[in-house]
Amino acid sequence: MGSSSATANRFLLSKIATSEGHGENSPYFDGWKAYDRNPFHPTKNPEGVIQMGLAENQLSFDSIEDWIKKNPKASICTPEGVEEFKNVAIFQDYHGFPEFRKAVAMFMSKARGGRVTFDPNRVVMSGGATGANELVMFCLADPGDAFLVPSPYYPAFFRDLGWRTGVQIVPVDCDSSNNFKITKEALEAAYEKAQKNNINVKGLIITNPSNPLGTTLDRNTLESLVEFINQKNIHLVCDEIYAATVFSSPTFTCISEVIQNMNCNPNLIHIVYSLSKDMGLPGLRVGIVYSYNDDVVNIGRKMSSFGLVSSQTQHMLPSMLLDEEFVARFLETSPKRLAKRHGVFTKGLEEVGINCLKSNAGLFCWMDLRRLLEDQTFDGEMVLWRVIVNEVGPNVSPGSSFKCVEPGWFRVCFANMDDETLEVALKRIRTFVRQGKKAQDQVVQVKSPKRWKSNLRLSFSSSSTRRFDQESVNVLSPHMMSPHSPLVRAKT
């Protein structure tokens, strides 16, 4: 189809559907495309791109698989469980199975150390955290309204919060001077800027633990956020989908703990949760909205009709999540494995002088490559990113995709691969840095087809910059979608 025909066809479609609201043209998704075209495999494609742009927890699958084998009756797809097939297959109310909501509420409590309890009647289902975030926006805001979001923040918030709802994002700028902590001054500045631009701010959304920082918010910060939204009479949405990934001190403090001892309006407090990160089950599409506002619960249930959790999943998970022995073991083992993997990765980077922001949670590191930039700008960051993806081989995500205010930061995921693949990725990165130091400001011609043995460089002359810009056109064009698009497979 020619470009003129494609343009004409767009006029036949809705503005929402044909807008750029999905964000697929960002470097965040370009890295996915590079991986999708040339995925790493230890024997079939050892020179391929290693996926380090996917925040997925694959370190505890064995625990879940072992439970499934020991509990065949939990699934309707086994001889032991097939007798429940009809009850699961027929029409289900959008409120969700009572046992499912009870199990989710119990797990949410245990994932937060049992310090708070959750009412199953306030659990609203959705298709993953993506659907849950959008559902909250539909409940709380009108098209054109805005939410404050501290940066750096999850790149797909642009899609999740605003593509179909028409809600705007107003970044709250945070920087490395205080390890990207959220300050009252930054909140006030963002709020006042929105007011001057006649933007109606309906709320503040935070991720705790943070994606991409891998840090947790302390009680004092959370209390200041609650005070801020109460003063402004706006909503606070807390995305807590990484609650059970905390692997070292300080411990996780959830918003529910904080408001127990505060004089605040609970109608303004809402939580988004999911089993995608804590349990590594993004394919099951379990998203949850937990609101202290009765109207949001009631309206959210109606809206959840457009993205329910499958009945089969609702049937299986209660048996697992209400198994106290399994849950206790899982919540003890999973963080230990994350801590070990985090330690291996960060120490491996430190061998060549690369540091990450100190973190205690999540499935990723916030890697500091500022000293490797020839040009301390976001253009310089993109030059370095293209070299890393195209020449070195891991798909990492540039900080600019997360609206970071400082160039040179990258999110690197470490929990979505086996130990051997992680070692290959580390070897490639370390070799790149070491050979770049030797090359200094010289542009060294790549001699070996093996990426981690190539003479790669860290400094880029204008000619080499143009060369990689050209490569980005040829290799990372947003219009070159492969049949198995990562945009289809992307996890929340």
Swiss-Prot record:
Role this protein plays: Catalyzes the formation of 1-aminocyclopropane-1-carboxylate, a direct precursor of ethylene in higher plants.
Catalytic activity, as annotated: S-adenosyl-L-methionine = 1-aminocyclopropane-1-carboxylate + S-methyl-5'-thioadenosine + H(+)
Pathway listed: Alkene biosynthesis; ethylene biosynthesis via S-adenosyl-L-methionine; ethylene from S-adenosyl-L-methionine: step 1/2
Assigned keywords, A-Z: Ethylene biosynthesis, Fruit ripening, Lyase, Pyridoxal phosphate, S-adenosyl-L-methionine
Sites bearing N6-(pyridoxal phosphate)lysine, chain numbering: K277
Similarity comment: Belongs to the class-I pyridoxal-phosphate-dependent aminotransferase family.
Keyword Isomerase (UniProt): no
Pfam families documented for this protein: Aminotran_1_2 (PF00155)
Protein name: 1-aminocyclopropane-1-carboxylate synthase 1
Enzyme Commission designation: 4.4.1.14
Quaternary structure, from the entry: Homodimer.
A single MF term (Gene Ontology): transaminase activity
Highest taxon in the source lineage: Eukaryota
InterPro entries assigned: Aminotransferase_I/II_large, Ethylene_sulfur-biosynth, NHTrfase_class1_PyrdxlP-BS, PyrdxlP-dep_Trfase, PyrdxlP-dep_Trfase_major, PyrdxlP-dep_Trfase_small
Single biological process term from Gene Ontology: fruit ripening
Cofactor annotation: pyridoxal 5'-phosphate
Record has Endoplasmic reticulum as a keyword: no
Lineage start: Eukaryota, Viridiplantae, Streptophyta, Embryophyta, Tracheophyta
Enzyme class per UniProt: lyase
CDD domains noted in UniProt: AAT_like
